[in-house]
From Swiss-Prot:
Name of the molecule in the record: Exportin-T
GO cellular component: cytoplasm; nuclear matrix; nuclear pore
Sorted UniProt keywords: Cytoplasm, Nucleus, RNA-binding, Transport, tRNA processing, tRNA-binding
GO molecular function, one term: small GTPase binding
Signal sequence extent: none
Family: Belongs to the exportin family.
Principal location class: nucleus
Source organism of this protein record: Aspergillus clavatus (strain ATCC 1007 / CBS 513.65 / DSM 816 / NCTC 3887 / NRRL 1 / QM 1276 / 107)
Pfam families listed in its UniProt record: Exportin-T, Xpo1
GO BP, sorted A to Z: tRNA processing; tRNA re-export from nucleus
Amino acid sequence: MEEQVANAIEIASNPSSEPALKAQAFDFVNQLRSDPSGWQVCLSLFTQTPQRSGIVRHVALEVVNGAAQGGLIDLQALAFVKDGLLAYLRQVYGQDAGASDPPNIQNKIAQTVTFLFSALYANGWETFFDDLLSLTYKSPSSTARDNASGIIFYLRVINSIHDEIGDVLVSRSRNEQDKANSLKDLIRQRDMQQITSSWQQILSEWRDGNDVIVEMCLKAVGSWVSWIDIGLVVNQTMLDLLFQQLGRAQKADLRQGEEKVRDAAVDVFTEIIGKKMKAEDKIDMIIFLNLDTIVSQLSNSPPLHANRFTFKYDTDLAETVAKLVNITVIDIVRALEQEGVSAECKEKANGLLQVFLPHILRFFSDEYDEVCSTVIPCVSDLLTYLRKIAKINPALAAQHSSILLPILKAIIAKMRYDDTSSWGDEDDQTDEAEFQELRKRLGVLQQIVASVNEQLYMEAVSEVVGTTFENLRQSGAQLDWRDLDLALHEMFLFGDLAVKAGSLYTKGSPNNQAAERLIEMMLRMVESDIRSFTHPATQLQYMEICVRYSSFFHHHTHLIPGVLESFLQLVHHPVKKVKTRSWYLFQRLVKQLRQYIGNVAQTVVEALGDLLVIQAEVSPEGSDGDEMSSEDHEGSADAVFNSQLYLFEAVGIICSTPTVPADKQVLYAQSVLNPIFLDMEKNLEAAKSHDERALLQIHHDIMALGTLARGFSDWMPGTNTPATLPAPEVSEAFNQVSEATLVALESLKTSFNVRTAARFAFSRLIGVLGSRILPQLPRWIDGLLTQTSSRDEMALFLRLLDQVIFGFKGEIYSILDTLLTPFLQRVFSGIADPTTGTDDEIRLAELKREYLNFLLAVLNNDLGAVIISERNQPIFETVISTIEHFSKDIDDFTTAKMAFSVLSKMGSSWGGPDIAPDATNGVPPQAALPGFSQFMISRFSPLCWALPTTPSFNSKDAQARQVLAEAGGLQRTIYSKTGMEYIAYLRDRELPGMGMGGELIEEFLGALSRLDLKGFRQFFPSFIQRLSA
């Protein structure tokens, strides 16, 4: 059997094995894993002499591990496994050991031994640590732990045990954690003394002899210290041994592997300080360990001092020491801010804070960002503490300036690009992203400093910015771009303090002192020769700042022409990232400065002409946008076109400023429109033949037309914006845009992309054309709502129509009357189509709600007559039946509630004048639709009971109660229109037919006739809840 298992493992692991035979071998080994007796063969295979091959032994032990952890081995059998493995360990690692196992086998054995420890240490293997420690001697007579292979295995198991029961980062169930805690208690009772004694002996005897042993031992001390008596580690014997290992940091040249020992020794101190204890005890511990001296010595050691700013600088050690500084300062600050800590302790902590401030600054200002990042948590805690103190007592803010100022200067210095860094190189994208993330974290720290001492922050930033612009004035392009970028970045962040409600000004005056400072900076920036500074990073920053602080130009309009000139140069930037971003920023700038720009349209249109050429690029087949990096996406054809659209909007904004005469607006608009019209005409035939590039070109052309229209007018029907419709001649010019889009849509309405672009253009053209667009509405609907239109498309278009109805309610009746039936038939078709999957169900629910919103828009804007006109009479029953269906949908309460709202509005609109008081809140009576009062009673009233009588209806559900309230509102509306006729119907037919008793009927009818609309809406849900109880 053993040979069979060994052969199967060899075949399964051999790449050159015949596939069918290999598959059989895999199956055999997998069956072995689940066989209750398979582990016995594998244990024998592993411990055999002479040894089997490495792969056989590895897999065999894996099977034993799997069986033990899977519960296939009972306690008695585990004892057998323990005896077998212990004999093996003594033979291979003990006093007569030859060559030990390779690391992968050692790790696998350590894993097995750790499991056996968990299962048997409490009961069955009480001598666990004695047995392992016996491996550390070469002979029973040895007085020193002199067996290297045995010590390494012992430490391997020690570290594995910590991972199993002591590592707080490992997720455990409640039972697992309880077991881990009881095992730790047992170790502390039985063996902790001898374990820590063994560490001291190993560190003493092997301190210079074997770096692997020393490193493993230090890791064991560092990991176990978190859950053992601190006195077992923090004692003079152990500390002397740790200090000896720290001494390696003073060596100029370390042998290979020695730096790991040194770093592990520092980590032990970090773990000691990280141990949970009272604030007073922690402060005393920091003082007792003399950590200030330790950190000072390490900071001044050759790897961190003499080698700093050279290629020999030891970043690993710097990061390791930074962790020690970070955890120490966090505990110092915790002692300072905790309530209940004695005054004496706080005084000690304050002293330590002053002592550690140079250490914080040393590592916070380290040129390597990973080192700086390591101490950011403690800097954040310290600044947050200072902010808390300053809030309680503002006078203390000035006292803390000796701490704040050097930290702030370090923050600002770290925000500067490194001298070795470049900008925009594709190879440096990861570094750039990491640096920007660091800048964000530093920005948060800077905000805290500003909140502690605003004046200090303003002075520091003003000095950096002022000095940089002065250097720029004197040396021009010789200035390092990194310095200018830093000054501009600080200006951008400064707005967090200076800008209120999007502006630097309130009633024409600067918001505050920070705004005054920023206005001075803006003047210096715009008036300096920054435009001649050609580095892309600073050019981008310049544009971002101009846009962010555009309110500055409202009060310095004489500077606008120069800034516009700069932007017009930068929109042609050779670096794609800068160029495409500048298109967006240009649009933002001109939109915010629209009323101040003046008549520069001709200049702008001519300057941008070459950038307004549209060239669609079809994505290569198989390219997957999801797998594209953000940088790649920014440069993709789609992303570039989306950015290009901002230029079209910017042109529209500039050409329609108040200073440009209407005839000139038309002229400039046509200079942009005509090339697009020609392009659409050129590509239409190819697009009709489903040419992918031609279809995409027409999509892009229509999107550009719609975007240009948006630039010309912000006006939207029914909104309260101050914008107005453009001059009639401008609207007439854009009528051509509508016609050109419709021609393309009518020819290409099967294309989703073309429909999407056309819907976009339609929504933008409304603002330029106003009511001129209404006669074309049937054509728009015919093109946008086709047999292939998705529910999403229908819902989006319904939303647009709501706006059109609201804006043009006085002019739309006849058109709406003509198109309502065919339009609703398409919507009904979309609602009736079967759904496939959750996403489809969500889209269906959205379409239902937009359909109901559309009906409400029609009714609320006094256009309800169109639904019951002679032309639309045939579809009226379908309209009502869909609403009835929605009102009974127990799976969609939102739609059901809306359905009742529509029915109530119909009752108010067509039910005639009120004959019962207080129902429609003063709405003037309308002429009754003949027979509608009876229709409401027979069709609408029963719906109010349909949902609550559904078996699965829960009357306590919050959404269900909202639906019932709306249903109660409908009942009150019916009563207000029909009075006693409705009361009689309810008393004689509807309520008895539901099995309701006389007392309940009278209670219900009394409430209906007595309560107003609001009162009955509250009554009905409670009434239903009582009936359901």
